[in-house]
């Protein structure tokens, strides 16, 4: 659960060894063999640490009044994982719902973490013969329509980045790329100068699992990038070896995921938009592209 570790900075917690040996080995397998991103591997790591704590309390290895967050997740061997039953897993799902207040989607994700862990123990490294999660289905999800900005709200957001920001060229450019290219946050933050091909009007992005894809740049993106890069490349004190496309104003180094989220959230609030997140811009891009083929330009903002 996110209250135990900072899930925004998975690299900070490497080598992810504050767990039982089987969990540590599994997380390494996810990154090295399965090709999962650090964020994905870290999510599984956090989920399995939490399950370890729960099982220690359920088996009486700590006193009943011990807070889950205070239980050491280490010290569980392969034999212990082999002793886990389907009933234990059902009780864990009930715990997530009743004590932790998890949404169905969060509970389903944590169950998926257990599915993956036991599949690894049974089918990848042959340490166990039975998978107690094999027949357990995730909670039925409520159907919720994706939330996205309307065309008018998107224009308001773009205008906000130009009037409320201390680095308007950068913030406007980031939002234009979000809205037109449907980038993930990690893809935008991870962009290097060498990934941009202005002549071919495309950007190389690295998504989940380090998968590479090329994204076309329309006129709006080209204009926003040119204006921002002209500003970026003439900033006093900028290290000429800095590869990151989007940098901070003060330290002139790669901007972080969290900082982008803060900037976008601030621009949304200034535009009177509530209940939206950076990820919703990805939904907005796909929806508006389908509905109107709308292009966002500086003239419209």
Where do the protein language model's features map onto the residues?
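Conserved catalytic core of the tyrosine transesterase superfamily
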Residues: 1-299
């Amino acid at each position: 659960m996110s209250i135990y570790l900072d899930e925004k900075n998975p690299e900070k917690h490497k080598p992810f060894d504050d767990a039982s040996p089987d969990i540590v080995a599994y997380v390494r397998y996810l990154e090295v063999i399965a090709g999962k991103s650090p964020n994905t591997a870290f999510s599984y790591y956090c989920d399995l640490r939490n399950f370890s704590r729960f099982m220690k309390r359920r088996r009486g290895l700590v006193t009943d009044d011990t807070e889950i967050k205070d239980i050491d997740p280490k010290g569980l061997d392969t034999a212990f994982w082999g002793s886990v039953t389907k009933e234990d897993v059902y009780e864990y799902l009930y715990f997530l719902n009743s004590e932790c207040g998890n949404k169905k989607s969060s509970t389903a994700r944590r169950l998926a973490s257990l599915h993956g862990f036991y599949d690894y123990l049974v089918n990848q490294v042959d340490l166990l013969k039975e998978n107690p999660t094999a027949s357990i289905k995730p909670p039925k999800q409520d159907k919720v329509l994706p939330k996205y900005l309307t065309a008018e709200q998107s224009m308001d957001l773009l205008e906000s980045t130009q009037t409320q920001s201390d680095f308007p060229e950068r913030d406007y450019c980031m939002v234009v790329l979000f809205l037109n290219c449907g980038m993930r946050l990690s893809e935008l933050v991870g962009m290097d100068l060498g990934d941009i091909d202005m002549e071919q009007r495309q950007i190389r992005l690295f998504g989940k699992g380090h998968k590479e894809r090329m994204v076309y740049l329309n006129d709006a993106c080209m204009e926003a990038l040119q204006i921002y890069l002209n500003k970026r490349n003439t900033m006093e004190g900028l290290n000429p070896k800095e590869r990151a496309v989007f940098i901070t104003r003060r330290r002139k180094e790669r901007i972080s995921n969290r900082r982008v989220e803060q900037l976008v959230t601030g621009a949304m609030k200034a535009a009177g938009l509530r209940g939206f997140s950076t990820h919703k811009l990805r939904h907005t891009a796909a929806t508006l592209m389908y509905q109107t083929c709308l292009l966002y330009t500086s003239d419209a903002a």
